[in-house]
Amino acid sequence: MSNSIHFSLIAIFLLLAVCSDVLAAEPASVVAPIPNVLVLGDSIYSQSTNNAASILRGRVNLKFATMQPGEVRNTHNALENLNDLLGDERWDLIHFNFGLGDLVYRAPNMKTFRVLPKTAGGIRTTSPALYEKNLRALVTRLKATGSKLIWASTTPIRHSSTGVFDMASEIEYNAIAARVMMEHGIPVNDMYSHVLKLIDMEKPAAHGADPFYFDRKPLYPPIVLSVLRQLDLIRPVRGPVQVFIMAGGWSHIGGGIVIDSVQPRPGQNRGTLDHLVLEGKNAVEYRHLLDQGGKWKTRSDVWIHFDRRGPKSGALGIGYGGDRKRCIGSELSFGITLGEHIEKQVCIIKTALGTPSLVSDLRSPSVGGHGQQPGTAYTNLLKQINESLDSLSDKFPDYTDDAGFEIAGFVLNVGEQDGDSDLYGEHLKALIADLRTDLKTPQLPFIIVGTGRGGRDDTEFPSIIQAQQQVVSLPEHQGNVAFVETRDFWPNKDARDAYRHPSNERWFDNAESFYLMGKAIGDQMIKLLP
């Protein structure tokens, strides 16, 4: 071996040794573990915990201590079964409430718990003095776990059709609990005040145990907010939050199939999002939908709210289509596109209007004769928008009034229920003007999504599409209204095999069609933004 080769090898070995030391000295990136939070309470917290867990996914692992069918949880059985309720897991935070089960009237002198009306000889499960004693014992044992604690006040009790509750009896017990928690330095999640603002306390009882029903009003927002605050996980957003509103019929709602709501499942049919990201011919273009672990990704810089068959809010991801667990519509790629281009926090309000006709259901105020009322869907649209904007902090716990919001864009996907193109054009022009007035945004960027169902060979909607394009081309709409062509996204192969697929009204539930549609909408919206 020559000297030059010998010295070269020595140099290489020395270089590798130095690099190894440098690499070894480089600190490994530490990923903070996701905190575990347990919710203890009666049955009203079961669904609320599920809702809250959906919003907190990726930030907090939230679990409800499950109950047996027919179980009425109160301070007595909570003390008796506390070890089982806590389980073997280490909890960073415990959110707890017991109250309704203590206030209910029960049959006396029975080993098994049975609800019995006061008028039939029932006795209140727990006296005020015993309630305080039990609470103090519970707090002592819960504090011994080393977990942080949050107490939730008991929700309001209104009329009970079966006489098993006394209206407003929770007020005394909430005062007792507040005193105990203050002595122990335990923060209180004021569920009582939250619910009191939402429900009609004078409404006659509609159920046997009316205090367990809340007129479909969401209970989860204060749970989410109190958990994040106690764990110091509130993330201030860059405002004002840019709000984009989406409205329309089935093509807007979307039915793009996702087989597995957690992680794409291999070997699925063409047209599913699972197939698209794993095995489709352009799969590499869709891999950004997955996180490093191969699960469906969410993005916290884009929020979304959709209220169809129940409200759902959170970080943008799958599950905001027609099936709230396993579907997508155009909102997914629309939001992704916006998030990639807008530095401020983005929020999508996806409205649910059924399958409206623009000319009748969405008729706006300035159309028609004097005194004619707007269409039902138009009124409902404004109601959904305003209710969503008024409760942004409930839906998105990182939102603050200091950040504020501004309505930044509107997407309309309506036309499949309309046949008269002349009337359609007239109503569309009026709708744009009226919505801008009602939303107090005179130059609101507006996207008209072309009625592309049926593709290029369709003979039903060309006149509607022409009317849409004519409205977009009006001088007053230049630079602030745009048209999105969707016929090229029609799944022709699914249409040819229609006997194997769902209705064409839902675009054969083809996920790629909805994804491409949303991407095109997003691209056009970006061009309209200042």
Label the predicted regions.
Residues V237-N269:
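N-terminal module-boundary/linker segments of secreted carbohydrate-active enzymes
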Residues N97-G101, M110, R136-I171, V359, ...:
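Active-site segments of SGNH/GDSL-like serine hydrolases
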Residues A24-K133, L228, G267-Y399, G404-F405, ...:
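Conserved SGNH/GDSL esterase-like catalytic core that processes O-acyl groups on lipids
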Residues N36-V39, L62-T66, D92-N97, L149-S153, ...:
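Structural recognition of the beta-strand scaffold that forms the well-ordered cores
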Residues S8-D21:
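Bacterial N-terminal signal peptides
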Residues N50-N51, R106-N109, S161-T162, I253-R265, ...:
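Short, solvent-exposed loop/turn and secondary-structure capping segments
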Residues T154-R235, G452-L529:
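Catalytic His-Asp segment of secreted/periplasmic serine-dependent ester chemistry enzymes
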